[in-house]
């Protein structure tokens, strides 16, 4: 086996920048990602617009999910968003692209949502057929639903423990 000569990170990056096949691969990947995001961009804009009308400056439903301060990552939105819970509950009941639906569910994965939030999550959990989203809902219920209520529904624990692989 031939040994390779050590390469610095800078030299590696320069070699990738000069490699037309590598650059073509990244252009193709970027186009695929843009096409994927375009599938649900209108839905995300609709939710963001409704949130802005409530006073929350977000550009995506995922801004509610990733809303805690971070020392390195820049956050579009930081802070509580209780006034958005009713709007998010409404969107939970509207058919959305899977990526948006997951963002809505994760945005409702809150301890302070009270019964309105966990009842809506439970209703969707019982209705959901996608095992991956059932896991996301079970995770949300584990956070949002009081334990004394959650123990009445062993299927939540089963879905959570399955990791979405039921």
Predicted regions span which residues?
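Amphipathic alpha-helical scaffolding segments comprising HEAT/armadillo-like alpha-solenoid repeats
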Residues: 4-10, 34-50, 79-94, 113-127, ...
